[in-house]
């Protein structure tokens, strides 16, 4: 019986790669055309599904061709080709099935299991979509691992005994990640990760396409933007020019018979693009790579001088301006000992071999890229799992109700770095009902977050009194938009002072409401006998506090809370009921501090 092989797959935006471990070392498998990378392109023609090189060859002539589908993974968007709407998972599954088939031909037996890589900044929906695509393709996806982490595995496999810190800069066709890892005694620990889910080589191509469109408008008085075939040819020519400019100072773009115009000669385009022009038109894209590097270093709490190596991953790192930016920021030459197109798949194969027990003494410790939490009273985002926390992890915290006789709570799960829930990404929500009717602050609702090794999150809420529970696995969040990914941490830093002030205002108001509710309840219950004169003073303070709550005068409210607490404590002393009163005061403080649902 043939030995079971777990293949490693880098399912890329532009190209995909499949690898296995043979005799303890990762090996990239060539496709049926003898190439080590396979274009992530699917074409439909005469009822046949064509994948890879042959599909890419049809981009310019066959409108039923799909490329860069990875950018739609985890969204509700579809692509209309072959007279049908296809979900991104379906197209990705066709690519995976193609990789699976040629792997089986190379290995000589059936392949059923795989480790697939994703960008570190992929959210839950995108990770789930990747697993679903694998399932459609007939693969059991044993593990989803982050691309920079996989690259580090491949780079460091023969260096596991040497302690070192490495930065992996991963710029692919459609996504960008920076991860910092520590390698020591066979452990690959991710210290931090940052990135942009919507930045990649496609964006550099698109800048050349825009330049060509403008050139054609100016020189030929023709707009080709509505001509699908012409645009496909421009895109292909732009990609080729970008690649040429990585090794040459200029690229010649030739597009014969680009547009056939009725009653006139066909338009043929010939243009020369200099590297200096290309770098000028794409400088804003290069600059977008800066912040994630700085964020990853800050989150890892290390200095640039602490880095032992810098690894460039992804075909887009061949762009000279990108290399120059990385090396200028880090003041270190990048290590070019790995193939940027292949190293991620090789790392995935290594992880597969670890899972299969073929490779020992290697432990991978990854992290979650953004903070996860829930919305609590006043719209506060209460974090449960901070960004760059090791996974897998389970974390629980107890919350309570905000209203008297509240029989249901809504759990809203948010992702991001801002203190207010509305300014973060809403990943999902669910209701927990059947809570026993009780005064606010009495029910105990335990909320548990579980992030598995694939980075997929499950949230469970349980009423500790009735044991009723409800849970959700985050599958329906859409992909973080370009602006959200790029701005999320930057906004948090820029607005930290204002956010903190707003969050403090909300917390102060909630504290005041809880205090008033607690004191009124204690006095009305008659558990403590307070002299009428003192009771009148407290009632006046409570009235003033309520007015300040309505007016949202937070600074005055803080002072009045202190005065109310002082007056109440004096009244208790006057009542000379120390034991009972001490207990009451402790309970009051506890209630004031407890976080609640609205």
Swiss-Prot record:
Q: Which PROSITE patterns match?
A: HSP70_1, HSP70_2, HSP70_3
Gene3D superfamilies reported in the protein's UniProt record: 1.20.1270.10, 3.30.420.40, Actin, Chain A, domain 4, Substrate Binding Domain Of DNAk, Chain A, domain 1
* Entry keyword annotation includes Chaperone: yes
The UniProt record describes its induction as: By stress conditions e.g. heat shock.
Q: Which UniProt keywords apply?
A: ATP-binding, Chaperone, Nucleotide-binding, Phosphoprotein, Stress response
Q: Has UniProt tagged this entry with the keyword Phosphoprotein?
A: yes
Q: Which GO terms describe its molecular function?
A: ATP binding; ATP-dependent protein folding chaperone; unfolded protein binding
Organism in which the protein naturally occurs: Mycoplasmopsis agalactiae (strain NCTC 10123 / CIP 59.7 / PG2) (Mycoplasma agalactiae)
What's the encoding gene here? dnaK
Name of protein: Chaperone protein DnaK
A Pfam family? HSP70
Identify the stretch(es) annotated as Disordered.
571-598
Question: Which family does the record assign?
Answer: Belongs to the heat shock protein 70 family.
Protein function: Acts as a chaperone.
Q: Which residues carry this modification: Phosphothreonine?
A: 175
Compositional bias of kind Low complexity: 571-591
